[in-house]
C-alpha cells in the first residue's frame, strides 16, 4: 500500500510540474489576469509614446496605391499633403503628370474633382468617402494622414479595452471610438493589425520603415476587395502650405453634385 501511495504521489507531482511548465514562455495568460493586464497597459503606453514622437506639422507624401479584386486591379500614384490633419489635399495620377482626381478634405467636408470629365462631387459628414468612389480604403483622409504620419492615437482614438492577443509578444485592444474594431500592437507598441468589427469587415496590416513610420498598408475585405498603400517618398517641408496650395478652385462651368450621385463607369474601372 505504501508503494502504491508513493507511486501516486510521484505521478501527481510529475503532472503538477508538467502543468507549471506548460504555463511558461509562449503561452498567454488570460486577458483578465494581472499579468495580462500589466502587459497590455505597458504596450498601450508604448503606443502613447510612439504617437507623441510625431507632432502635427506640414508634410508631403508620395504614394502608390494598388487596388481591386482578384484578376482586376488598378495602380495609381498620388501626392498627399497638408499642414496637419484638418485641411488636406490629395492628387491622384494614372501616369506621369496625368491627374485623374483632385481631392480636398477639410473639417469633415470632402470634395473630389475629375479634370477629365469636368465634374465635381461633394460630401459632408464622418463617413468614409473614398469607399464611395470605389477606392477600397476605409479611412477618411484625416485618419489616413494621422496614421501615415505616426499619430496613431489621432487615427485610432484613445478609448480601449484589452482583449485576448494572438501571441505573447503582442497586445490586442477593442477600440471604443473612432474606427472601432480590434487593434493589435507589437512589442514596441506599434500598431501592426486592425480588424473591423463583424465578420464581413476590413482588415489592415501595417509595415514600418526605419523611422517607425508606416511605409505600407495592406487592406483586405471579406468581399475580395484589396488595396495596398505604399509610401514611396516623404518630403521635408520647411514652410506651412498656403490656403491656395491646399485649396481647389473649380472651373466656373463645373457641375457640382452630391457624392451620393457618383456612379462608377460602365467598364467597371474606378473613376475619376
Task: Locate predicted features.
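Extracytoplasmic segments of membrane-associated envelope/inner-membrane machinery
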Residues: 128-158, 173-179
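Hydrophobic lipid-interacting interfaces of membrane-associated proteins
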Residues: 64-70, 95-98, 113, 178-181, ...
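Gly/Pro-enriched, hydrophobic low-complexity segments
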Residues: 157-265, 269
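Sec-dependent bacterial lipoprotein signal peptides
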Residues: 1-20
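N-terminal leader/targeting segments and the immediate start of mature chains
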Residues: 20-75, 250-255, 260-272
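Amphipathic hydrophobic-ligand
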Residues: 72-76, 101-105, 200, 226-227
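One face of beta-strands
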Residues: 57-65, 76-78, 86-92, 101, ...
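An acidic-aromatic
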Residues: 86-142, 225
Amino acid at each position: 500500500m505504501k508503494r502504491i501511495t508513493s507511486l501516486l504521489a510521484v505521478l501527481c507531482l510529475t503532472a503538477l510540474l508538467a502543468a507549471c511548465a506548460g504555463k511558461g514562455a509562449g503561452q498567454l495568460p488570460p486577458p483578465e489576469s494581472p499579468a495580462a493586464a500589466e502587459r497590455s497597459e505597458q504596450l498601450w503606453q508604448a503606443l502613447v509614446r510612439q504617437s507623441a514622437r510625431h507632432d502635427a506639422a506640414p508634410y508631403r507624401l508620395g504614394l502608390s496605391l494598388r487596388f481591386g479584386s482578384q484578376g482586376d486591379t488598378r495602380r495609381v500614384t498620388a501626392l498627399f499633403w497638408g499642414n496637419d490633419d484638418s485641411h488636406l489635399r490629395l492628387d491622384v495620377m494614372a501616369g506621369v503628370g496625368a491627374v485623374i482626381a483632385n481631392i480636398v478634405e477639410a473639417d469633415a467636408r470632402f470634395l473630389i474633382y475629375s479634370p477629365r470629365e469636368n465634374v465635381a462631387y461633394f460630401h459632408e459628414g464622418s463617413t468614409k468617402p473614398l469607399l464611395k468612389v470605389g477606392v477600397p480604403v476605409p479611412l477618411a483622409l484625416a485618419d489616413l494622414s494621422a496614421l501615415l504620419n505616426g499619430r496613431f492615437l489621432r487615427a485610432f482614438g484613445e478609448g480601449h479595452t484589452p482583449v485576448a492577443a494572438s501571441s505573447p509578444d503582442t497586445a490586442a485592444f477593442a477600440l471604443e471610438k473612432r474606427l472601432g474594431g480590434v487593434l493589435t500592437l507589437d512589442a514596441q507598441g506599434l500598431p501592426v493589425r486592425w480588424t473591423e468589427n463583424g465578420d464581413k469587415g476590413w482588415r489592415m496590416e501595417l509595415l514600418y520603415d526605419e523611422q517607425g513610420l508606416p511605409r505600407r498598408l495592406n487592406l483586405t475585405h471579406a468581399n475580395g476587395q484589396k488595396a495596398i498603400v505604399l509610401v514611396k517618398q516623404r518630403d521635408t517641408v520647411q514652410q506651412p502650405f498656403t490656403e491656395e496650395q491646399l485649396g481647389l478652385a473649380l472651373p466656373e462651368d463645373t457641375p457640382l453634385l452630391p457624392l451620393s450621385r457618383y456612379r462608377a463607369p460602365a467598364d467597371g474601372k474606378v473613376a475619376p
